[in-house]
From Swiss-Prot:
The active site is at C262 (nucleophile), H347, E349. It is an enzyme of class 6 (ligase). It comes from Sulfurisphaera tokodaii (strain DSM 16993 / JCM 10545 / NBRC 100140 / 7) (Sulfolobus tokodaii). NCBIfam families: CPSaseIIsmall (TIGR01368), PRK12838.1 (NF009475). L-glutamine binds at S53, G234, G236, L263, Q266, N304, G306, Y307. Gene3D superfamilies: 3.40.50.880, Carbamoyl-phosphate synthase small subunit, N-terminal domain. Belongs to the CarA family. One of its GO terms (biological process) is glutamine metabolic process. Its EC number is 6.3.5.5. This is Carbamoyl phosphate synthase small chain. Composed of two chains; the small (or glutamine) chain promotes the hydrolysis of glutamine to ammonia, which is used by the large (or ammonia) chain to synthesize carbamoyl phosphate. Tetramer of heterodimers (alpha,beta)4. Residues 186-372 form the Glutamine amidotransferase type-1 domain. It catalyses: hydrogencarbonate + L-glutamine + 2 ATP + H2O = carbamoyl phosphate + L-glutamate + 2 ADP + phosphate + 2 H(+).
Length: 372
């Protein structure tokens, strides 16, 4: 059967196990390589595609229709985006079952137009369920996405593995960025690719936020006299970030409150003597349950991580379990028993996702206020 492609060109996805999937191209024509991962989120593709944690990855969205509500115009509060997670699309490529035209009053462009304008290839009209089943059974693998081109020698694009690249070099700012607050309390965000949703939640609590590069010197961080420090999310293998890990250790000597989120949770774990390992296919969804051990309450949370603390034995010394995932037992947060450090593997800010656990930021604010 002849494949009809509404954008006029075909596309392909090559997986490192030799699987070749043919579909229709959309967005920009081009060839890109990346780690193939999937999200089960049913909405929030503008936020997902701009999440720096997806840098270096080809994202497969399991929901069958993607693009229905288009792409909105960027909106900001004190320089912080309120409807995107960064200034640009971060994924290497996008794979969907069906790319649809938008029908919503505030759409400024279609998904196709957005990817086209930012040079990102897309692939549609493929069986995303079969891709997800393969990734779920075999584990994440490298792949090559081609839109408007055939992949003649895919292996040449796969010479370097995702786990071997420090992607924070592409997602961390080159110089400090300040977002003014109204409480007089200044916090520093160590920005390895932080989501604007995290910045927004911090700004809503009145903080003046100083975003510093991922590998910013600790003495320069302390020049801002921060009342607290946040290590936010970001892409890639945390075990490669030895400079960031050492900076975290050095910061603990000042005994100021620290909040680690996602990659920040992993950096904190490694810095304090715990272990972080690669997961088979990770958690990428907006409906993952976590249990708060202190209250025995279950919350529905947003996740985007391919590494984690896989068991209680991997927790750092002098830490106590805070959150655990009831599905697979992975550690979703811990609290240090001697230092003012709290961490979550999940995203308390959501974006996209439920706001069940935004109170984590309130807990951090109380820690900062006590320190002030």
């Amino acid at each position: 059967m002849t494949l009809y492609c509404k954008r006029g060109y075909k596309g392909y996805l090559y997986l490192e196990d030799g699987t070749l999937i043919e579909g229709c191209g959309f967005g920009a024509k081009g060839i890109r390589a990346g780690e193939v991962v999937f999200t089960t989120s049913m909405n929030g593709y503008p936020e997902s595609l701009t999440d720096p944690s997806y840098r270096g990855q080809i994202l497969v969205i399991t929901h069958p229709l993607v693009g229905n509500y288009g792409v909105p115009e960027k909106q900001r509060v004190e320089g912080i985006l309120t409807n995107f997670e960064s200034e640009q699309i971060q994924v290497e490529g996008l794979v969907v079952s069906e790319e649809t035209d938008p029908f919503k009053w505030n759409s400024s462009k279609s998904l196709h137009e957005w990817l086209l304008s930012e040079g990102v290839p897309g692939l549609s009209d493929v069986d995303t369920r079969s891709i997800v089943k393969k990734v779920r059974s075999r584990g994440v693998m490298m792949g090559v996405i081609a839109s408007g081109y055939e992949i003649e020698d895919p292996k040449k694009f796969l010479e370097k593995k995702y786990d071997e690249i420090d992607f924070t070099q592409f997602t961390s700012p080159k110089a400090p960025i300040v977002h003014l607050g109204n409480t007089g309390e200044t916090i520093v965000v160590v920005d390895c690719g932080v989501k604007h949703g995290i910045l927004y939640q911090l700004h809503q609590r009145g903080f003046t936020i100083v975003r510093v590069p991922c590998k910013f010197n600790v003495s320069k961080i302390m020049d801002y006299y921060p009342k607290g420090v946040v290590f936010g999310n970001g892409p890639g293998n945390p075990n490669l970030l030895q400079e960031v890990i050492e900076n975290f250790k050095e910061l603990t000597e000042y005994k100021i409150p620290i909040l680690g989120i996602c990659l920040g949770h992993q950096v904190a774990t490694l810095a304090m003597g715990g272990k972080v390992n690669k997961m088979k296919f990770g958690h990428r969804a907006i409906n993952k349950p976590v249990i708060d051990i202190s209250s025995n309450k279950c919350y529905i949370t947003t996740h985007n991580h391919g590494y984690g603390i896989l068991s209680k034995e991997d927790l750092p010394p002098n830490s106590k379990l805070w959150f655990i995932n009831p599905d697979d037992g992975t550690i979703e947060g811990w609290i240090h028993e001697k230092l003012p450090i709290i961490t979550t593997q999940f995203h308390p800010e959501a974006r996209p996702g439920p706001w069940d656990v935004t109170w984590v930021f309130d807990k951090f604010k109380k820690m900062v206020s006590r320190n002030a």
